[in-house]
């Protein structure tokens, strides 16, 4: 019978071992190592070891669950807000065949969140729901992607516990070795750029830092003093280290309201693809929320990039 204890540093090797055992062979699997767990979880703002419960039996660590209240903050803790009426479960890791352990870990997290005042709980939320300081880069994508649709046993337990799908996502991937395709997109970008440039716009690339990702590059289109379109991109370091392939991530596209409908979303994406290729990227992927039809159509139709993996967030109202 497993006992649950708050995370302690001596748990770390066993926690990593069970993670790698459970996720091996899954979508975009990258073996977890201590330095990545520290960078992506334990050293992140808001990490609370009391909210990472580790399951141990006589043989050692057999699973864990990590949970907490919804938080929203971007570049500094001074901006942080906490909403205890909504909880989130960032990770539940246990052998899929051990249904009783999975249920026990889930029950423990739900009970703790409910006792803290949660009236709704998200399971594997992505950035659509709230700020995600944890597991970016180590959970199957450059960003925290959600729960893989391949985890059938866990999805079955969640359904039995009243969790229902709240959001669906995809990670489309663009292979930059397809130079003919990239060249065709660059020709389309040049046509859009000529129209925008005639209106006095300029473009720039700069570096940006945040609490959640390694330094990234931002591609911007600027009109006067206003940034009218932008997107950020950077190398997915854990994936490159594990697979020897330089897969980059793109983290969202923003177009100013008064400039929408002019092709700037497509333009800024193509400029980011080109900039990543110039840096030596082999491929680029990004995280798309299916409820955002504008973005879904941009990535899957205008750019012709097809989903490679599918993910979802679930929710339960208490």
Segments predicted by a language model, with ranges:
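Conserved GNAT acetyl-CoA-binding A-motif
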Residues: 113-130, 135-136, 140-145, 276-287
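A short beta-loop-alpha structural element at the N-terminal edge
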Residues: 2-17, 176-178, 194-205
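Conserved GNAT-fold acetyl-CoA-binding loop/helix
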Residues: 23-40, 191-205
């Amino acid at each position: 019978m497993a006992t649950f204890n708050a995370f302690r540093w001596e748990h770390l090797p066993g926690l990593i071992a069970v993670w790698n055992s459970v996720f091996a062979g899954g979508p975009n699997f990258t073996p977890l190592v201590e330095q990545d767990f520290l960078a992506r979880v334990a050293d992140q703002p808001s990490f609370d070891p009391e909210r990472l419960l580790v399951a141990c039996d006589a043989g050692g660590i057999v699973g864990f669950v990590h949970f907490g209240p919804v938080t929203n903050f971007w570049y500094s803790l001074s901006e942080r807000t906490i909403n205890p009426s909504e909880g989130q479960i960032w990770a539940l890791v246990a052998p899929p065949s051990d249904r009783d352990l999975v249920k026990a870990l889930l029950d423990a997290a739900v009970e703790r969140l409910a006792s803290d005042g949660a009236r709704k709980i998200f399971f594997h939320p992505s950035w659509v729901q709230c700020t995600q300081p944890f597991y970016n880069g180590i959970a199957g994508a450059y960003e925290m992607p959600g729960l893989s649709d391949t985890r059938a046993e866990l999805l079955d337990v969640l359904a039995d516990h009243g969790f229902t799908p709240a959001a669906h996502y995809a990670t489309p991937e663009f292979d930059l070795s397809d130079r003919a395709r990239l060249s065709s997109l660059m020709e389309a970008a040049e046509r859009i750029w000529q129209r925008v440039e005639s209106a006095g716009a300029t473009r720039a690339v700069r570096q940006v830092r945040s609490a959640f990702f390694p330094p990234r590059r931002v591609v911007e289109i600027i009109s006067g003093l206003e940034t009218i379109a932008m997107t950020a991109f950077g190398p997915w370091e854990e994936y490159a280290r594990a697979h020897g392939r330089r897969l980059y991530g793109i983290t969202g596209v923003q177009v100013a309201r008064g400039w929408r409908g002019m092709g700037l979303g497509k333009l800024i994406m193509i400029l980011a693809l080109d900039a990543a290729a110039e840096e030596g990227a082999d491929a680029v992927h990004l995280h798309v929320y299916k409820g955002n039809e504008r973005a879904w159509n941009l990535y899957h139709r205008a750019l012709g990039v097809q989903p490679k993996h599918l993910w979802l967030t679930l929710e339960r109202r208490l």
